[in-house]
């Protein structure tokens, strides 16, 4: 399998080790309805190095550890299947948004989606939506903002804006009763 071949080249915890080496903490990511967020707490003296790493990550993602990430997502999905809170949340959104993706599918997808992921479709999604006019960089802390913006502009200058497909959906019927 592709995952089996890729695992031969995977470097365990490569990204986390790189972040730790520059003093970063709190490395994490999450996806919600309208966004995917990557977070790190980075020392100000490592900001330029961090920006360079992030720019390279988005230039041409290496998906050699995709199989292990998928396993983590699959586990998260399995936990949600056993969670009353998740069931209430999904039922609520399915009831409120009968014609919108908020109610038609969960952010994480279905078990079937996770069983048969297409790297081709993942790359297509990445190249469609991970474009500069659909992204934001948010920084806070003890650094010179003008220097940081200049460094971000330089590091991400290879990216070119392009049209992002507009999501369209049918108007929901008014809720007239509890």
Region locations from a protein language model:
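Active-site recognition of the HExxH zinc-binding catalytic motif
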Residues: 1
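Non-catalytic beta-strand/loop surface segments
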Residues: 4-45, 80-134, 158-178
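M16/insulysin-pitrilysin zinc metalloprotease superfamily fold
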Residues: 5, 40-70
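Hydrophobic face of alpha-helices
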Residues: 12, 51, 67-70, 89, ...
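Soluble periplasmic/extracytoplasmic beta-strand elements of cell-envelope proteins
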Residues: 37-41, 50, 136-142
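Generic, well-ordered alpha-helical scaffold segments in large soluble proteins
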Residues: 53, 57, 76, 95, ...
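Acidic/histidine-enriched alpha-helical segments
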Residues: 62-78, 144, 163-177
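Non-catalytic, conformational "gating/processing" segments within enzyme and secreted inhibitor domains
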Residues: 70-71, 119-155
């Amino acid at each position: 399998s592709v995952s089996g071949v890729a695992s031969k080249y995977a470097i365990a915890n490569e990204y986390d080790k790189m972040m730790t080496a520059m003093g970063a903490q709190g490395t994490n990511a999450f996806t919600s309805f309208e966004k995917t967020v990557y977070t790190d707490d980075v020392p100000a003296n490592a900001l330029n190095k961090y920006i360079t790493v992030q720019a390279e990550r988005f230039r041409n993602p290496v998906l050699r550890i995709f199989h292990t990430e998928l396993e983590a997502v699959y586990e998260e999905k399995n936990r949600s299947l056993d969670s009353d809170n998740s069931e209430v949340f999904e039922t609520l959104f399915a009831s409120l948004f009968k014609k919108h993706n908020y109610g038609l599918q969960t952010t994480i997808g279905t078990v079937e989606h996770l069983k048969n992921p297409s790297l081709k479709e993942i790359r297509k999604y990445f190249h469609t939506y991970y474009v500069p006019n659909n992204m934001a960089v948010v920084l806070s802390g003890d650094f010179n903002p003008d220097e940081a913006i200049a460094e971000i502009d330089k590091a991400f200058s290879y990216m070119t804006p392009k049209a992002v497909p507009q999501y369209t959906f049918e108007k929901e019927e008014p809720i007239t009763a509890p």
